[in-house]
C-alpha cells in the first residue's frame, strides 16, 4: 500500500495543495512553498507515537500578514492505493475491509478525510470519515478504530525530526537500547553477505555494516546531544573512509537481482535501530512512510551518495525534501516534484511515470540531471544555442544590473540535447522558459520548433522567443558596434577591405569562440549599459518578467 495523493485545504501555511505521490518522491521548492506544513500534516495525522490527532486553533490557515483573517474550516484527504490489484485482500488489510473503494482502473483505494471546524469561542472540532470514489462518506462502524489501524499499518517516520531532537536533548527518550538484538541482526547480515563475498573479507563486511549503523544513527540523533543519547556504535571505525567504501560495495550487493532477502534483513535492522533508540514500537505489519528532511545535512557529497543509496534500498515509500543539487544528480528526474507557491495555492509539478519518451528522458538525464542538477531549482530557463551565447548573455545581463542567479534564471545551451525535450521538460516541471536563436538555417528551424510548441500563438511567441537578425551571435555583435573588438582579436586593421565572415573566422581562429565572446562582453562593460543591444535588453526584461511570475 502506498500513499498516492495528499490534498490539503487551509492547513497552517498551505491554502490549497494537491500532491500526487509515488514510491520515491524528492520534493524541491523555494523556502516558502509550505514544506513544514506538509511534513507536519503527515507526521501529526499518521504518527505511530500517539493517539489520533485533534486539530488546534493554530492549524488553520490565514492570509500572510492577516492573522485576523484566519479560516474556520480545514480539510485533508489522504488517498491510499493498494500496491497491486487484489492486494487489499491480504491478511493485514482485512480489518480495513469496509474502507476500501474499488476504482475504474482496477485498483482499490482508501480515501481518508479529516476536517477541522473552528468555533467563535476558540474551540475546535475534528471530524474523520472514509469516502467512496465519488467523495461521499462510507458508513463505517467505528471510524476512529479503523483510522488507528490504518496508522498502525502505514505510520510516518520523520527522519531528523526536530521534536525528536528536542526529546533527546531533554533526556526524555527512554534509555532501553536493544543492543543485543541489533548485534545479532548485524552478525546475521554479515554472515549472509560473506557467503557472496564480492572480494570483501569478514572484517571488511563488518566495517561496512558498522558504517551503516553509524549512518542510520546520523538520521536519528544529533552529534553531541548529551548523556541521554545512547550510541549503538561502540567505537568509530579505525579508518572511516575505508568503511564508507565497504558500505558502498555492500549497498551494491544488496541492490542486485536476488538481493530481496538482504533488504528484508536491512529493514529489520532499521526497525531495531528505531526501537533501540526508544522512540517507538512499530506494528509487525507496519510498512512505514519515510519522511527525510534535507538528507544532505552535515554529509560530504561522497557520503551523501552512499547514504542515499542505502536509504533507497529500504523497501519503503519515501518522501524526501532537499536543497541539494548533488542529491538531485542521484535522483531520476521522474521522482522529482517541484512545489511553487502561487497566489491561491501551492502548485505541484512533476513528470510522473509516463512523462517523457525513453530518448527524451535519456537526454534530459544527461543534460540536466548529471550536468546541471541545480537548474531544477530555477524559476526560468533562458535556452541558447551554444557556449558563445552563454558567456555573452550572462555577462551582458550583469552589465545591465541583472543578477540572473538571484532571480532564479539559468542560461542553458540546448544544441547538444535538442530544444524540444528541454522545453517539454520545463513545461511539465512548471519552469518558465525563453529561447534565443540565431538567424541562420538551424536557428530558423529552432524558431519553427518553438512556434509549433506554442501552436503559432503570436502573443506567446513574444514571451518565449527571441531571434537574432544575423547569422549568429558573432555577426550580430559585430553589427551592433563591436567591430573593433573583432578586428583587434583577428589582428586585422579596421580599414582593410575583407569579407565580414572572414574577419570573424580569423578572430575565432586566433583565440576561441568563448574568449571572443568574453572580450565582446568586457568591452560592453567598459562602454556602459547603452552599448548593450536593445534587442537583448528587451529579452532580459521579458525573462525577468517570466521569472518573477509575470507580476511586474
UniProtKB/Swiss-Prot annotation:
CDD domains: TOPRIM_OLD. PROSITE patterns: TOPRIM. This is Uncharacterized protein YbjD. InterPro entries: DUF2813 (IPR022602), P-loop_NTPase (IPR027417), TOPRIM_dom (IPR006171), TOPRIM_OLD (IPR034139). ATP binds at residues 29-36. It comes from Escherichia coli (strain K12). GO terms for molecular function: ATP binding. Keywords: ATP-binding, Nucleotide-binding. One of its GO terms (biological process) is DNA synthesis involved in DNA repair. Residues 379-469 form the Toprim domain. It holds the Pfam family DUF2813. It comes from the Bacteria.
